[in-house]
Amino acid sequence: MASGVQVADEVCRIFYDMKVRKCSTPEEVKKRKKAVIFCLSPDKKCIIVEEGKEILVGDVGVTVTDPFKHFVEMLPEKDCRYALYDASFETKESKKEELMFFLWAPEQAPLKSKMIYASSKDAIKKKFQGIKHECQANGPEDLNRACIAEKLGGSLVVAFEGSPV
């Protein structure tokens, strides 16, 4: 079911910048986004970047000790959101970084909000071509490291964001 909600150009630009890794100077790498949260505009017609709801690679280890925990804490308790998270994880063979797309729809969110976010998900997913991992979370229990490791590769994943799973 389509909702007719549009996706802002800035959302598409952020996705492209997170997906495409260019050769960058250390300063440019620090400005790369680790996580970004998206919301509906006040008129509910467009998916936009939620102001102030991002983690930069340069923040990790400086102002943010655990990027995934910080990301989860940025999500509202009583409303829905979309998010992109640049997951760093290790398998038994190698270290990897892959983008994850999240639909956050907590139980306490208003029914109308859950409906519009669910029906608008396809619009944003069409813009996010090449996402390997998608996760719908309905509460904090869906966002623990073990659940995320399962989405990233199950028993092959041995560490997520530097912590064993």
Curated annotation (Swiss-Prot):
InterPro entries: ADF-H, ADF-H/Gelsolin-like_dom_sf, ADF/Cofilin. A motif (Nuclear localization signal) lies at residues 30-34. GO terms for biological process: actin filament fragmentation; actin filament severing. The keyword ATP-binding does not apply. It holds the Pfam family Cofilin_ADF. Residues 4-153 form the ADF-H domain. One of its GO terms (cellular component) is actin cytoskeleton. SMART domains: ADF. CDD domains: ADF_cofilin_like (cd11286). Keywords: Acetylation, Actin-binding. The modification N-acetylalanine is found at A2. GO terms for molecular function: actin filament binding. Belongs to the actin-binding proteins ADF family. Actin-depolymerizing protein. Severs actin filaments (F-actin) and binds to actin monomers (G-actin). Acts in a pH-independent manner. This is Destrin. The gene is DSTN.
